[in-house]
Amino acid sequence: MPARKIILSNDIRVKPTENTLKIGTNKSVDIDGMKVTTLKSTDEGVAFIIEYKGKIIYHAGDLNDWYWEGEDEKENLRMRESYRHIIKKGFENIPKVDIAFLLVDPRQENECGCGTDFFLENVEAKHIFPMHFWGDHKRVEEYIRTRKENIYTITHTQQVFELEGLI
């Protein structure tokens, strides 16, 4: 396993240490055999694609289809197109990931999983963990019931999952 490093988006204001690496959008770095690639976010920071020992982990960060009911339709469609372009381009050579951390944000009401839906229509994911749901576990459970993919149900903060044989 590589030495421990803290990898942050370069727009986060913290004093770097020797174990901190700040990285901008659409960049790749290799850290002791672990490749970390970033994608531009549709909000703040970056999304991460991590490749290590033949496995791929995706963490969406704030990269999402931020479609807000009641907001300007032009802006919603611009955001949707931006998100879809970033996902298609970022994963054009990565058809499958082992773990995906994807947004299911109940503040988006009926569109709470639209970014996750698009991602899963375009990228196969073995293990899917919803995030960014502001403690609204019931809304996430409702969303999961509508999907056929292997989306893990998260019932409380700091819940631990063990995935056998991943690395």
Residue ranges with predicted function:
Residues 84-90, 108-118:
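A short, acidic, amphipathic alpha-helical segment used as a generic capping/interface helix at domain edges
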Residues 65-67, 106-109:
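Short acidic, S/G/P-rich loop/turn micro-motifs used as interaction or catalytic elements
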Residues 1-4, 93-94, 119-124:
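Short, conserved loop/helix-junction motifs that constitute active-site signature segments
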Residues 19-96, 159-167:
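Core dinuclear metal-dependent hydrolase active-site scaffold
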